[in-house]
Amino acid sequence: MLDCRAIILLWLLPWATQGLAVPRSSSPDWAQCQQLSRNLCTLAWSAHTPVGQMDLLREEGEEETKSDVPRIQCGDGCDPQGLKDNSQFCLQRIRQGLVFYKHLLDSDIFTGEPSLLPDSPVDQLHTSLLGLSQLLQPEDHHWETQQMPRLSPSQQWQRSLLRSKILRSLQAFLAIAARVFAHGAATLTEPLVPTA
């Protein structure tokens, strides 16, 4: 009786002999994800430029809120080998982060800000976060969304600090996501096969 590896190799043989790429299930358009993530990085930096000493302050309770913030970690499969083996877990983690930050941009922390007017950097950032998260959502698969933290600062200065903190955290998240998509676009994009 053949073991699983032999069966898989036999199943892949027709594609290998014809020079075809092995079909991937629910694989995103890596090049489009790369372009959108680059755009998001640029928008995140234009939405939050460092403002003197404010960015150097360490907000009280910062360590407590770090556990709520989505991070791409080693076990998420976003490393080159993890992406090659099965990119879905990594893409799910990135999508969860994008949705998390989109909800934060929708929150009262950012409401009433002149920077949220249509076509402002934060508004464009919000729209692009939504676009990339939808691109990562396979049509036939619905991922769970995590519980969103409740942030309701009562004072204007608290909102300003939280906005700064959220945008800095978003910049770091997007930088890592952009690296993942750049690697995916360079190595995981299926080659076009000429039709005869």
Swiss-Prot record:
An example GO BP is:
negative regulation of interleukin-10 production
Q: Where in the cell is it found?
A: Secreted
Broad class of the protein's primary localization? secreted
Q: Which residues form the signal peptide?
A: 1-21
Which residue pairs form cystines in this protein?
none
Q: Which InterPro entries match?
A: 4_helix_cytokine-like_core, IL-23_alpha
Please report a single Pfam family linked to this protein: IL23
State the UniProt keywords alphabetically.
Antiviral defense, Cytokine, Disulfide bond, Immunity, Inflammatory response, Innate immunity, Secreted, Signal, Tissue remodeling
Q: Does the keyword Cytoplasm apply?
A: no
Q: Key word Secreted present in the record?
A: yes
Alphabetically, the GO molecular function entries are:
cytokine activity; interleukin-23 receptor binding
What is any one of the record's Gene Ontology cellular component terms? extracellular space
Annotated function: Associates with IL12B to form the pro-inflammatory cytokine IL-23 that plays different roles in innate and adaptive immunity. Released by antigen-presenting cells such as dendritic cells or macrophages, binds to a heterodimeric receptor complex composed of IL12RB1 and IL23R to activate JAK2 and TYK2 which then phosphorylate the receptor to form a docking site leading to the phosphorylation of STAT3 and STAT4. This process leads to activation of several pathways including p38 MAPK or NF-kappa-B and promotes the production of pro-inflammatory cytokines such as interleukin-17A/IL17A.
Task: Describe its assembly.
Answer: Heterodimer with IL12B; disulfide-linked. The heterodimer is known as interleukin IL-23. Interacts with IL23R; this interaction enables recruitment of IL12RB1.
Q: Which PANTHER family match?
A: INTERLEUKIN-23 SUBUNIT ALPHA, SGRF
Q: Which family does it belong to?
A: Belongs to the IL-6 superfamily.
Quote the protein name from its UniProt record: Interleukin-23 subunit alpha
